[in-house]
Design a protein with these regions (language model features):
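Active-site region of glycoside hydrolase catalytic domains
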Residues: 1, 24, 43-45, 54-293
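N-terminal structural segment of carbohydrate-active enzymes
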Residues: 1-49, 53, 59-65
Length: 293
């Protein structure tokens, strides 16, 4: 309509000052925002873009001026294309590249920012990107998926070490989109499907990062990617955990009914969603106010 599009969107890049003024007016005391990797290092590796550093510095300074604590997320799914061309998160080299990027972030912002989140919802961009192909890079490849799980976990550990080596006083964690998993019935098939879904959605990253081990149902699939001392690197003394929550999932055993509309995975993973006559958001998420508890 009227040739309108979403290119400009909220225009936070140009209007961040008034946005932060609005935050201050409603007494927000923190602001979690995500860095664009390409804005800081356009090619993913190598030369740093001073204009990108300048923008985030001004954003951070404005937050601090208004007594708003900045919480920086390093990665929110926008991988530089040059790195995807090298294999993306299925490539183990990404673990060192991400650590270098995280180091650049702390060198430039660690003097003013105390809280850093390595990844936002890693289960989303790995499942959607490497299993059902809904998101970039659009693969339907379980082997790449399992490789990406381990590489993201390892990248978190290496980034943690790199950032702490520069400033041991900063706080570092990871943010997950956890969801209660409810079996559709008490049948053994549905119970097993629910355990599988819980493994992939809730535990494939939280368990290695915060417990130091992969879930039992995942270990065989990722074991070929684990090298000596990897698990020690992954299991750091994280300072906090971030939890995002949207809905719960009703799980049933089903090789064909996939989570196309409201979730993820393809027919190679044997579970699906049970359809219920319940209220949904416009994004198709079930409205369950008590699911977070």
């Amino acid at each position: 309509k009227n040739n309108e599009n979403g290119d400009t969107a909220v225009d936070h890049y140009h209007r961040y000052e008034e946005d932060i003024e609005l935050m201050a007016n409603i007494n927000l005391n923190s602001y979690r925002f995500s860095l664009a990797w390409t804005r800081i290092i356009p090619d993913g590796i190598g030369k740093i873009n001073p204009k990108g550093i300048d923008f985030y510095s001004r954003l951070i300074d404005k937050c601090l001026e208004k007594n708003i604590e900045p919480f920086i997320t390093l990665y929110h799914w926008d991988l530089p294309q040059s790195l995807q061309d090298k294999g993306g998160w299925a490539n183990r080299d990404m673990t060192n590249i991400f650590a270098d990027y995280s180091e650049a972030v702390v060198k430039n912002f660690g003097d003013r920012c105390n809280h850093f989140i390595t990844f936002n919802e890693p289960a989303v961009f790995t499942i959607y990107g490497y299993v059902d192909g809904y998101m970039a890079p659009g693969y339907k490849d379980l082997e790449k998926y399992f490789a990406s799980i381990h590489n993201v976990n390892l990248a978190h550990g290496k980034a943690f070490q790199a950032m702490k080596s520069l400033n041991n006083n900063i706080k570092i964690g990871c943010s997950f989109n956890m969801a209660p998993c409810i079996p559709a019935t008490k049948s053994s098939e549905d119970l097993h499907a629910t355990k599988l879904f819980d493994t992939y959605w809730n535990r494939s990253f939280a368990d290695p990062m915060y417990l130091g081990k992969y879930p039992e149902l995942l270990i065989d699939d990722v074991s070929k990617h684990i090298q000596q001392d990897d698990m020690k690197t992954i299991f750091q003394k994280n300072d906090f955990i971030g939890l995002n929550h949207y809905q719960h999932y009703r799980i049933k055993a089903d090789n064909n009914n996939l989570l196309k509309a409201r979730g993820a995975v393809n027919d190679e993973l044997p579970f699906g969603l049970e359809d219920k006559d319940t209220k949904l958001t416009l994004m198709g998420w079930e409205i369950v106010p008590d699911a977070y508890y």
